[in-house]
């Protein structure tokens, strides 16, 4: 596993323009409802007197039949990347583009190349986001735990960011592979993560999307080769500057972000969530739905009673409490975290091995969504023409130029005709989620696969069909061997099969029966931090 091209929408929450601080609002605006929140101990009423968030309307810059060669995202012409590098296998894929292994032709040194589709950049803010990401990577260059940018290049179709190759895989994968680790090791990893936060803040940068997936190892055998990647949501900030756009990932988002009044303190909260997961294997704020997670974050209750917390040191729990303090002004700064006794050099974090159950939970935490995603694909592929006739009609109605693909503008206009009240950012989120091949448009097959979340998933006959696909021998149970065969068929080789079985298998017989399968499919998709067609599209499909 190498550098991954993380989706800017798949793993994020979007409420408004994610690149604009409060004081930079433009005169042309639209009104969006505030995030629902219960009463909390911390009073933010003075900071949030308006009942609604006012955000700028994005000005589109990309249109069908526009010659993309006539403008530069980077603002200037660059050398042809293929004159300097050889691009080879794909390392990862996200909503904006794909990351490839690339080799410097002159030196033979391997790098990672994140290629961003210019067709995805549908507004001026999108272009500014890419420019800012590159600027921030250059600005932070030189820190030993931040991925190093080599250069940025542009051609008629893509912006290419060449950066240091992190071939050691994700932080969590390394922990799982190790089989056990101690509080001391968790303290060492936390020191690296918070050190990145301190470096960013000292240089006037707020990361805004810290999470374990955004930390990769350069060398799988060296835990200290950890590097922060993906600065796509990062912004420059000035002391005292207030931001109110809701960005991040559900498990890791700070309460003040949900309340749309925040600054760099939110990064410390997120680092505290990561620390809690490192020590327990589960996030501190948990629910079956995204709104439930948000409510838990705003409530702020931290569980230190259930296993393994009774055997975790008091010093570790003290640090977590101070990092997950609901009041940003009372929360530790990154510098103060690094001075805490549990984390500092020769600190008090014990070297006692943590409960193996923590590792098990980590594996289960990462495995569930892979099976669910595979099952959704199976359902999409099993639908008959009769079942999708209504969806085909909807697709054809949206595809106004009969090109066989829906553009952003066509999707926006089509949803309006069907009664949708979604914001532009939410519509863009849906489009990015549905556009599997990153073409900048949604083709027919992608549209069907996405819209089955609306009106097909809960149909029992389709759940039966999907279950039968996995139940190869028709025994009424999905076994680990059958699951392995299905994973191979779908090219999913990095799945922890035993943990999928364990998580779904409610009666502990080592198999998944139909009722357990249905329960998994109907369970809130809590591990995915993006809006989906199912939970975002505010239209009725009964007559479609």
Swiss-Prot record:
<feature type="binding site">
    <location>
        <position position="482"/>
    </location>
    <ligand>
        <name>Ca(2+) 3</name>
    </ligand>
</feature>
<comment type="subunit">
    <text>Interacts with SLAC1. Interacts with FD.</text>
</comment>
<dbReference type="GO" id="GO:0005739">
    <property type="term" value="C:mitochondrion"/>
</dbReference>
<dbReference type="GO" id="GO:0005634">
    <property type="term" value="C:nucleus"/>
</dbReference>
<keyword id="KW-0479">Metal-binding</keyword>
<keyword id="KW-0723">Serine/threonine-protein kinase</keyword>
<protein>
    <recommendedName>
        <fullName>Calcium-dependent protein kinase 6</fullName>
        <ecNumber>2.7.11.1</ecNumber>
    </recommendedName>
</protein>
<dbReference type="InterPro" id="IPR008271">
    <property type="entry name" value="Ser/Thr_kinase_AS"/>
</dbReference>
<feature type="binding site">
    <location>
        <position position="403"/>
    </location>
    <ligand>
        <name>Ca(2+) 1</name>
    </ligand>
</feature>
<feature type="binding site">
    <location>
        <position position="439"/>
    </location>
    <ligand>
        <name>Ca(2+) 2</name>
    </ligand>
</feature>
<dbReference type="GO" id="GO:0005509">
    <property type="term" value="F:calcium ion binding"/>
</dbReference>
<keyword id="KW-0597">Phosphoprotein</keyword>
<dbReference type="GO" id="GO:0004674">
    <property type="term" value="F:protein serine/threonine kinase activity"/>
</dbReference>
<dbReference type="GO" id="GO:0005524">
    <property type="term" value="F:ATP binding"/>
</dbReference>
<dbReference type="GO" id="GO:1902456">
    <property type="term" value="P:regulation of stomatal opening"/>
</dbReference>
<dbReference type="Pfam" id="PF00069">
    <property type="entry name" value="Pkinase"/>
</dbReference>
<dbReference type="GO" id="GO:0016020">
    <property type="term" value="C:membrane"/>
</dbReference>
<feature type="binding site">
    <location>
        <position position="399"/>
    </location>
    <ligand>
        <name>Ca(2+) 1</name>
    </ligand>
</feature>
<feature type="binding site">
    <location>
        <position position="477"/>
    </location>
    <ligand>
        <name>Ca(2+) 3</name>
    </ligand>
</feature>
<keyword id="KW-0677">Repeat</keyword>
<feature type="binding site">
    <location>
        <begin position="91"/>
        <end position="99"/>
    </location>
    <ligand>
        <name>ATP</name>
    </ligand>
</feature>
<dbReference type="Pfam" id="PF13499">
    <property type="entry name" value="EF-hand_7"/>
</dbReference>
<dbReference type="GO" id="GO:0106310">
    <property type="term" value="F:protein serine kinase activity"/>
</dbReference>
<keyword id="KW-0106">Calcium</keyword>
<feature type="binding site">
    <location>
        <position position="505"/>
    </location>
    <ligand>
        <name>Ca(2+) 4</name>
    </ligand>
</feature>
<feature type="binding site">
    <location>
        <position position="516"/>
    </location>
    <ligand>
        <name>Ca(2+) 4</name>
    </ligand>
</feature>
<feature type="domain" description="EF-hand 2">
    <location>
        <begin position="422"/>
        <end position="457"/>
    </location>
</feature>
<keyword id="KW-0418">Kinase</keyword>
<feature type="binding site">
    <location>
        <position position="441"/>
    </location>
    <ligand>
        <name>Ca(2+) 2</name>
    </ligand>
</feature>
<keyword id="KW-0472">Membrane</keyword>
<dbReference type="InterPro" id="IPR011992">
    <property type="entry name" value="EF-hand-dom_pair"/>
</dbReference>
<dbReference type="InterPro" id="IPR017441">
    <property type="entry name" value="Protein_kinase_ATP_BS"/>
</dbReference>
<keyword id="KW-0519">Myristate</keyword>
<feature type="binding site">
    <location>
        <position position="437"/>
    </location>
    <ligand>
        <name>Ca(2+) 2</name>
    </ligand>
</feature>
<feature type="binding site">
    <location>
        <position position="410"/>
    </location>
    <ligand>
        <name>Ca(2+) 1</name>
    </ligand>
</feature>
<comment type="function">
    <text>May play a role in signal transduction pathways that involve calcium as a second messenger. Functions in abscisic acid (ABA) regulation of guard cell S-type anion- and Ca(2+)-permeable channels and stomatal closure. Phosphorylates FD.</text>
</comment>
<feature type="active site" description="Proton acceptor">
    <location>
        <position position="209"/>
    </location>
</feature>
<dbReference type="GO" id="GO:0046777">
    <property type="term" value="P:protein autophosphorylation"/>
</dbReference>
<keyword id="KW-0547">Nucleotide-binding</keyword>
<dbReference type="GO" id="GO:0009738">
    <property type="term" value="P:abscisic acid-activated signaling pathway"/>
</dbReference>
<dbReference type="GO" id="GO:0005886">
    <property type="term" value="C:plasma membrane"/>
</dbReference>
<feature type="binding site">
    <location>
        <position position="511"/>
    </location>
    <ligand>
        <name>Ca(2+) 4</name>
    </ligand>
</feature>
